[in-house]
Amino acid sequence: MEQAPEDQGPQREPYNEWTLELLEELKSEAVRHFPRIWLHSLGQYIYETYGDTWAGVEALIRILQQLLFIHFRIGCQHSRIGITRQRRARNGSSRS
């Protein structure tokens, strides 16, 4: 007869504790890169849409992650991750 495998892995942090820590880290990073009024408006939107629920926390985490990713990818002045924009000659001299 088959038996379920025993849980021999390391003890995991509770999901809600981990989620709240992640949200705090994202909020502190977002404050460095976006105007506070934008973040306040986003928080109001999330609260009006989801209320004070875990679904709202998860939605806020997802949106902040997406905003920060795009912000860094476009080329944040504070980061080395962004795309480096290169000026191209318009006279065709760089063509082979």
UniProtKB/Swiss-Prot annotation:
<comment type="similarity">
    <text>Belongs to the HIV-1 VPR protein family.</text>
</comment>
<comment type="subunit">
    <text>Homooligomer, may form homodimer. Interacts with p6-gag region of the Pr55 Gag precursor protein through a (Leu-X-X)4 motif near the C-terminus of the P6gag protein. Interacts with host UNG. May interact with host RAD23A/HHR23A. Interacts with host VPRBP/DCAF1, leading to hijack the CUL4A-RBX1-DDB1-DCAF1/VPRBP complex, mediating ubiquitination of host proteins such as TERT and ZGPAT and arrest of the cell cycle in G2 phase.</text>
</comment>
<feature type="modified residue" description="Phosphoserine; by host">
    <location>
        <position position="96"/>
    </location>
</feature>
<keyword id="KW-0945">Host-virus interaction</keyword>
<dbReference type="GO" id="GO:0042025">
    <property type="term" value="C:host cell nucleus"/>
</dbReference>
<dbReference type="GO" id="GO:0046718">
    <property type="term" value="P:symbiont entry into host cell"/>
</dbReference>
<dbReference type="GO" id="GO:0075732">
    <property type="term" value="P:viral penetration into host nucleus"/>
</dbReference>
<dbReference type="GO" id="GO:0034220">
    <property type="term" value="P:monoatomic ion transmembrane transport"/>
</dbReference>
<keyword id="KW-0946">Virion</keyword>
<feature type="region of interest" description="Homooligomerization">
    <location>
        <begin position="1"/>
        <end position="42"/>
    </location>
</feature>
<comment type="function">
    <text>During virus entry, plays a role in the transport of the viral pre-integration (PIC) complex to the host nucleus. This function is crucial for viral infection of non-dividing macrophages. May act directly at the nuclear pore complex, by binding nucleoporins phenylalanine-glycine (FG)-repeat regions.</text>
</comment>
<keyword id="KW-0406">Ion transport</keyword>
<comment type="function">
    <text>During virus replication, may deplete host UNG protein, and incude G2-M cell cycle arrest. Acts by targeting specific host proteins for degradation by the 26S proteasome, through association with the cellular CUL4A-DDB1 E3 ligase complex by direct interaction with host VPRPB/DCAF-1. Cell cycle arrest reportedly occurs within hours of infection and is not blocked by antiviral agents, suggesting that it is initiated by the VPR carried into the virion. Additionally, VPR induces apoptosis in a cell cycle dependent manner suggesting that these two effects are mechanistically linked.</text>
</comment>
<dbReference type="GO" id="GO:0039592">
    <property type="term" value="P:symbiont-mediated arrest of host cell cycle during G2/M transition"/>
</dbReference>
<keyword id="KW-0010">Activator</keyword>
<keyword id="KW-0804">Transcription</keyword>
<dbReference type="GO" id="GO:0006351">
    <property type="term" value="P:DNA-templated transcription"/>
</dbReference>
<dbReference type="Pfam" id="PF00522">
    <property type="entry name" value="VPR"/>
</dbReference>
<keyword id="KW-0597">Phosphoprotein</keyword>
<keyword id="KW-1121">Modulation of host cell cycle by virus</keyword>
<keyword id="KW-1048">Host nucleus</keyword>
<keyword id="KW-0131">Cell cycle</keyword>
<feature type="modified residue" description="Phosphoserine; by host">
    <location>
        <position position="79"/>
    </location>
</feature>
<keyword id="KW-1160">Virus entry into host cell</keyword>
<dbReference type="GO" id="GO:0006355">
    <property type="term" value="P:regulation of DNA-templated transcription"/>
</dbReference>
<dbReference type="GO" id="GO:0043657">
    <property type="term" value="C:host cell"/>
</dbReference>
<dbReference type="InterPro" id="IPR000012">
    <property type="entry name" value="RetroV_VpR/X"/>
</dbReference>
<dbReference type="GO" id="GO:0044423">
    <property type="term" value="C:virion component"/>
</dbReference>
<dbReference type="GO" id="GO:0052151">
    <property type="term" value="P:symbiont-mediated activation of host apoptosis"/>
</dbReference>
<keyword id="KW-0805">Transcription regulation</keyword>
<keyword id="KW-0014">AIDS</keyword>
<dbReference type="GO" id="GO:0043655">
    <property type="term" value="C:host extracellular space"/>
</dbReference>
<protein>
    <recommendedName>
        <fullName>Protein Vpr</fullName>
    </recommendedName>
</protein>
<keyword id="KW-0407">Ion channel</keyword>
<feature type="modified residue" description="Phosphoserine; by host">
    <location>
        <position position="94"/>
    </location>
</feature>
<keyword id="KW-0053">Apoptosis</keyword>
<keyword id="KW-0813">Transport</keyword>
<dbReference type="GO" id="GO:0051260">
    <property type="term" value="P:protein homooligomerization"/>
</dbReference>
<keyword id="KW-1079">Host G2/M cell cycle arrest by virus</keyword>
<keyword id="KW-1163">Viral penetration into host nucleus</keyword>
